[in-house]
Amino acid sequence: MAYSFTEKKRIRKSFAKRATVHQVPFLLATQIESYTQFLQADTPPARRKTEGLQAAFNAIFPISSHNGLARMEFVSYHLSNPPFDVKECQQRGLTFHSALRAKVRLIINDRENPGKVKEVKEQEVYMGEIPLMTSTGSFVINGTERVIVSQLHRSPGVFFEHDKGKTHSSGKLLFSARIIPYRGSWLDFEFDPKDILYFRVDRRRKMPVTILLKSIGLTPEQILAHFFVFDNFTLQSEGAQLEFVPERLRGEVARFDIADKNGRVVVEKDKRINAKHIRDLDSAGTKLISVPEDYLLGRVLAKNIIDPDTGEVIANANDELTEALLENLREAGVKQIQTLYTNDLDQGPYMSQTLRVDETADQTAARIAIYRMMRPGEPPTEEAVEALFQRLFYSEESYDLSRVGRMKVNSRLGRPSGEGAMVLQDEDILETIKILVNLRNGKGEVDDIDHLGNRRVRCVGELAENQFRAGLSRVERAVKERLGQAETENLMPHDLINSKPISSAIREFFGSSQLSQFMDQTNPLSEITHKRRVSALGPGGLTRERAGFEVRDVHPTHYGRVCPIETPEGPNIGLINSLALYARLNEYGFLETPYRKVVDSKLTDEVDYLSAIEEGKYVVAQANATVDADGNLTDELVSAREGSERETRMVTPDRVQYIDVAPSQIVSAAASLVPFLEHDDANRALMGANMQRQAVPCLRPDKPLVGTGIERTVAVDSGTAVQAMRGGVVDYVDAMRIVIRVNDDEAVAGEVGVDIYNLIKYTRSNQNTNINQRPMVKVGDHVARGDVIADGASTDLGELALGQNMLVAFMPWNGYNFEDSILISERVVAEDRYTSIHIEELSVVARDTKLGPEEITRDISNLAEAQLARLDESGITYIGAEVEAGDVLVGKVTPKGETQLTPEEKLLRAIFGEKASDVKDTSLRVPSGMSGIVIDVQVFTREGVTRDKRAQSIIDDELKRYRLDLNDQLRIVEGDAFQRLERLLVDKTVNGGPKKLAKGAKITKEYLADIDKYHWFDIRPADEELAAQLEAVKEAIEQKRHEFDLAFEEKRKKLTQGDELPPGVIKMVKVYLAVKRRLQPGDKMAGRHGNKGVVSKIVPIEDMPYMADGTPADIVLNPLGVPSRMNVGQILETHLGWAARGLGQRIGDMLKAQAKAQELRTLLSQIYNESGKPEDLDSLSDAEVLELANNLKKGVPFATPVFDGAHEDEIRRMLDLAYPDDVAREKGLTASKQQVTLFDGRTGEAFERPVTLGVMHMLKLHHLVDDKMHARSTGPYSLVTQQPLGGKAQFGGQRFGEMEVWALEAYGASYVLQEMLTVKSDDVNGRTKVYENIVKGEHSIDAGMPESFNVLVKEIRSLGIDIDLDRY
């Protein structure tokens, strides 16, 4: 097995028992692929598929004028290069976008001869700006990173369901069907409690379904023929003969004696007809049964009956037979009649009853009825009626089932899936009603709407396409109106197309849609999880209030597609989910998961992706099935899922068709990072998965000693760790950049063979956490494509590292860890283990006001010298300044309005020309409760305003950095070129050259070294071909120089042009403060198993419980937090972490003793290769083994994959290996080595029983006490109630609520209560009076009338009740 550059630095020992045949796919693929398909930017126009932008253009164009003489056709579109890159957009507050231009053709026909083309105009038209996706799957909108969350919505198609007996008091099941298109009107069919079938369009008034059937051209006879089978009767003078159909009589009670053709009675009256009776009648060759007259009465006619002589209609289809009607039929000589066959069991008379309720006569009347329902009050003209009916379901402009919808309709109605129009067809409506009637008759099953075969994912590309199409259709309307003038006014395409509607639709979607969210950027995991989220909320989705339990619940089809664990707690539970690790979307937007094919009980290497619908056809075994070395299933019975319900049952191996690809395939990325997940209760696992997303990146990231093996995948896929784009040799490294000279075989001809990686340094994330990248390569290192070359936030050697490994003891400690509180050693704080850096952005703008422009300046009166010392001559603080609350960061003065001056002031002004009072100080100051170091300043100046020195120096620094990059590229390009030249020139004969090189002389290496490299081009080789090569190299270098000069000039132009600022803003300054947050009491911490708590006390290191060898614990947790929470995973993690720490110490001791590489190999082999997944240590050189050992000193990292992790005996084995008996005795370990005798740090006495001690990976969460702590004496008040505002952001007070009032009442603290409800709250006069009294030194309260009482009086008056206050 080949290890990558970073993997071999620290190999994670894996306990996985099963080899993976299928690698975890790229975690951001769903988002990136969806948007790539939407744009198709890199695909030539001729080869673009009909999807995304192309589909939207194709759907709207061509646009024809109302008179048909002019039309506009779409040719192609292209996206220009973005004007600014991602970083520049973030700094300037711009959107990272590309301009969309479409080539359109305007065709104008001749007025006299409409068939003849008069003129054709083709032009490229600007169609607005389309935001581009960054390489990590996010969007930069107005300078902030946002994510478009995928939406899980009900798929278009036809669905059948019932109300579960909730509608009617009897509990009767009322069946309904719904045809949902992608775009257009919904069509519902529903039974009412009287079993009459109705339909409704777009949830409007319901109407009998036969109206709809008549409107599509069916007569009552045809309707009955579609839904019923007929009984054939031959009328006789008395009674009739019924055509014998055996299955129709079975189960009925005979209403008369039934005889065979010989007259023998087979079934007596009032007896139930059973199978034997049917057989007897059948064997006797019975074809007809004589029935009495009353058997005919009440039966329903299937067809119109017409008098053969007169042609008059005697009876209509759906009429009931009565004695009078039978008499008329006999008189008219009618012999044969057909009636509807119905029964109470499986052939109800529903359509017949519905026809009776329906009062419309024919197709026209039916369509008019539909028109009146859709457009009440409008007169139904023939054209209007026809147009509306066509537009409802048959017009491609207003109705679209989409490919998915057509596929779902066809598969549900039992047709070949891919065929059919995208609009509704008559057969679709008829078949749907038939299936619904069959359901009511007890045949077939209703659909499960929570099945993932009936819910699909709308990804970024599709959501953006819908918005673009909406904008384009607004453009279409405007173009249609103006096309008529195109000929007369000689207009060009750009005169007709206004791109504003498109831009505004796109801007609205990306800026303010419910699915466009501010990216959660706390750490790499939260970033990746946000992009893999699927939400059932949003436009066209569910709402929190209406979503019931079933929608939120875990469904069997979620297996391998949606994570059953990771979902928010609270009102959104179950509505917002995360994609499972291996899930992907198919072409229809349904979620698929991979399964490994099994043939004849043997696993193959073939992997198939199955959607929820396809999976229902197969028997799928679980990944933990026992498999031998050859891949055969060995158990007699295997646990597998089968049937549409996906119930788990035991099956024989020969029935298994597929098996899971990995045990972790059912969970999401966040849940798969929890080791021993299988031992945690589901609720706590949910909290653990969610809290990892809130972990704040620490100053020094520390990889988890106990991981799951997925850490590297998450770190790399999130984009926070830098990967090498191409293999090569590291040429230059510093903290800011890495330069790699690309391998010859990977370099593309004509391109620069240099990759430069500018690292992100101390940059603010959306959540104000710090993003910082650190190089992990040295000059001369060989790296391959995809190797991690720099660590980012929360990554350690290319692995995700959200927290720190802490030595944890489970024991109570003086009540300080009561109720999940956490006790922490002072050492943890002193070593900065949980110190994090947070970056705050503070900005100030100078505007043009009515009284004159605001000015950013150092010249501010009444400002202390100490404050001014921090500002440069432009009035802006310098980088590196340490500032505290209230310090000035940017000096700014605002013109003040002219005020009435006193005579004295006028005199002073006349004498001294005192002007200082004309301006007021509006400088940017550090907010209260904040202190830090200024790490960056950015100045933006409007076009036309001269830059100050500070702004100019920032631009100069940026250009210097860019020039450095270009110089490095040029240096390497030239270096490669001159090396190649040297190989070409050495030992070649010349005609002459610099330094008097004689004709016929041979070139030597020494000669070339002696002259300047640029003089090599002056050498005149004798070989003409060589001379041509020499010239070609010279031209190539000059070409590159020219390109770099152009690039530099472009960059300079970009930086020196004025910035786009909001209207009225002259200058904007942004100051970035780095705030260091140490761990302190009140901060929230958590493990990965949902074990969360608040730091209660930081204890001096000498008072912490310690081991026999003097090692103190870092954290003391309460053991009572484990049993009731049922998250035993944390105990197993602690034991395995303890083993990892011990093994690291053993390796460290060996390195101290300068052990040979072979000894190290022996120990490493015992650790890595005696259980779990073996590692190829022999492929490492001795130097690499030594580097590996050095990186393992702090602990050997373990991987225990979810559902395939370490077993108890493996943990014991590792503990025995880590702590041989002599070491165990020295440390005071018990025989199991899982517990240890601890001593009280304060008394030195041993605790009375052994304590579980080990290493746990603990996280500091983004709920820091510094952000929550807040105090107020006086501050802002609410305008109406005059009560203090609430919350830290408003500088509010503490609410004294109803229950608190009760408490003071209970204690009888009347004066405290009066003070609380009046002068401390909303008694305006009382508040000022108290202040006056305090100033005077009088400590008394004069409580007045609370403002809230006045508000109450006003509210009562608003009801028209005159209420007044009698003051005595």
Curated annotation (Swiss-Prot):
Gene3D superfamilies, A to Z: 2.40.50.100, 2.40.50.150, 3.90.1100.10, 6.10.140.1670, DNA-directed RNA polymerase, beta subunit, external 1 domain, DNA-directed RNA polymerase, subunit 2, domain 6, RNA polymerase alpha subunit dimerisation domain, RNA polymerase Rpb2, domain 2
EC number: 2.7.7.6
Annotated Gene Ontology cellular component terms: DNA-directed RNA polymerase complex
Leader sequence segment: none
Catalyzed chemical reaction(s): RNA(n) + a ribonucleoside 5'-triphosphate = RNA(n+1) + diphosphate
GO biological process assignments: DNA-templated transcription
Keywords carried by this UniProt record: DNA-directed RNA polymerase, Nucleotidyltransferase, Transcription, Transferase
Domain of life from the UniProt record: Bacteria
Any matching Pfam family: RNA_pol_Rpb2_3
Described purpose of this protein according to its UniProt entry: DNA-dependent RNA polymerase catalyzes the transcription of DNA into RNA using the four ribonucleoside triphosphates as substrates.
PANTHER family, alphabetized: DNA-DIRECTED RNA POLYMERASE I SUBUNIT 2
Subunit-level organization: The RNAP catalytic core consists of 2 alpha, 1 beta, 1 beta' and 1 omega subunit. When a sigma factor is associated with the core the holoenzyme is formed, which can initiate transcription.
Name of this chain's protein: DNA-directed RNA polymerase subunit beta
Organism expressing this protein natively: Cupriavidus taiwanensis (strain DSM 17343 / BCRC 17206 / CCUG 44338 / CIP 107171 / LMG 19424 / R1) (Ralstonia taiwanensis (strain LMG 19424))
